[in-house]
Structures are given as structure tokens and as C-alpha cells.
Amino acid sequence: MPANRFNGFTEYGVGIGLRIPHYRHILTKKPIVDWFEIISENYMIDGGRPLEVLDKILDQYKVVQHGVSMYFGSASDPDPEHLRRLKQLVKRTNTPWLSDHLCWGSVDGRYTHDLLPMPYT
């Protein structure tokens, strides 16, 4: 198959996860990497060190977002506030794509904070 079978996906190269223990190294050493993956929910906040670091990273790198709490498989609709903050973060990062898990993890507004498998029904 040709390398472009993913409609440009491969043009983004190789990325690594942006995690708190790596902040200092990344900001001081400026490693050669194509992009960083952020966990969306860690940056869906109103200020603070994570957003300060994210803005510095965005000055030099592309960022892609990966979520861990959309719970597409739950019976409830997605939380409108979560979607609002997610949209706000997408605009801030100008991410080329956003991913999340196909799972469930909430019932009646109560969250398990786990990625539970979809039932085989």
C-alpha cells in the first residue's frame, strides 16, 4: 500500500507523550521530535502551570490530543461542559486530530474514571 493511505497521517512523523516529569527537559533541551501527545483532560483547565508549559510547547512543536473520558459507549449523552472545554483546547492547540477511547465509564452522572470495555451485544 502507498504511504499516503491514511490521507496525510504519516506526514506528521513521530511523536511522544507530554508528561509532567518531562516538562523541564523538553523546555531546556528542546529535543528533536515531530510532535507531542497531550491528554486533553489534563489541559482543560482555567490556567496554571500545565497551560503555561503547553503554550511554550506550542511555540515550537505540534501537539495532538488524546482524551480519556468521553465514554462514547456510555448510555448518557456527552457532558456539554466537557465538550465546551475540549473545543476550547482544540482551538488553543490547533491539533491536527483528536482521539479518545471507544469504551464506557459513567452511569447516571457517576464516573468510574476507568476505560471499561463495550459489551458484546
Explain the meaning of each model-derived region.
Residues 12-18, 34-38, 63-66, 96-100:
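Hydrophobic faces of well-ordered beta-strands that scaffold small-molecule active sites
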Residues 11-20, 70-77, 115-121:
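Active-site mouth loops of central-metabolism enzymes
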Residues 81-121:
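Active-site acidic/histidine proton-transfer and metal-coordination neighborhood
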Residues 40-52, 71-80:
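Acidic-and-aromatic substrate-binding clefts and catalytic sites of carbohydrate-active enzymes
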Residues 20-22, 40-42, 69-71, 102-106:
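Active-site-proximal loop/turn and secondary-structure-junction residues that shape catalytic pockets
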Residues 2-26:
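Boundary/entry segment of secreted carbohydrate-active catalytic domains
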Residues 25-31, 48-65, 81-96:
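Acidic (Asp/Glu)-rich catalytic clusters
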Residues 60, 67-78, 102:
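Structured, acidic catalytic/metal-binding patches in enzyme active sites
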